[in-house]
Regions:
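Conserved short "hinge" loops at termini or chain/domain junctions
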Residues: 1-105, 139-141, 145-185
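Short conserved catalytic/interaction loops centered on acidic-Pro-aromatic/His motifs
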Residues: 129-139
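Short, hydrophobic/amphipathic alpha-helical patches that form generic packing surfaces
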Residues: 60, 111-127
């Protein structure tokens, strides 16, 4: 039995984080040898079309990462309407087992946010500042590993205590099977 769970990551929030990260990297890279590093590395509205393409690629990669848990309905929407990724938030519906620990939903959302941001930053840096791209690619791998680990967490089945009121419920209770006194104890 599965329970559907919706996950949504705001494209505007991701792009804001991408802008902050690239501005920081650009500011850090400014030197006498490279005084124009900030203008080259920091993203602007002029880069929107390219960043939208990176957004779609990151969303596709995230969907592949979550493929095992995507509902059939979600997979159809993603495969038949890829243009949704350029203008809208990243939204997926997951089919989770009932024993999945739903307390980790916020952590999955945040790891997915990190995955999307760092995927876009990595692609951008491969174009503008290759020496920093490897560090962000490692962050993408870490986020992917974290998402997978969080998706695989299951709650332990509850244990019945020996003094619980449902002792023997499976066999009709102690009154039907005689209880310990019939076993010679």
């Amino acid at each position: 039995m599965t329970i559907t769970q919706n996950i949504q990551v705001s494209k505007a929030r991701v792009m804001d984080e991408v802008a902050k990260a690239t501005a920081y990297i650009g500011q850090k890279a400014v030197s006498q040898q490279d005084p124009d590093a900030y203008e080259r590395i920091a993203t602007t509205d002029a880069n929107r079309e390219e960043l939208d393409r990176y957004w779609m690629e990151a969303c596709t990669a995230a969907s592949l990462l979550l493929d095992h848990w995507l509902t059939d309905q979600t997979s159809q929407v993603l495969s038949h309407h890829p243009e949704l990724g350029t203008a809208h938030d990243y939204k997926v519906t997951l089919g989770m087992p009932t024993n999945w620990n739903f307390a980790y939903l916020t952590s999955v959302n945040e790891a997915l946010m990190s995955y999307l941001v760092n995927s876009i930053v990595t692609k951008w840096l491969l174009r503008t500042q290759k020496q920093d791209a490897a560090a962000y690619a490692a962050l993408v791998e870490d986020a992917a590993r974290q998402i997978t680990q969080l998706m695989l967490v299951r709650k332990r089945p509850p244990r019945r205590s020996s003094g619980s009121s449902d002792d023997g419920e499976l066999w009709g209770g102690p009154q039907l099977w005689g209880g310990p006194q019939l076993w010679g104890h």
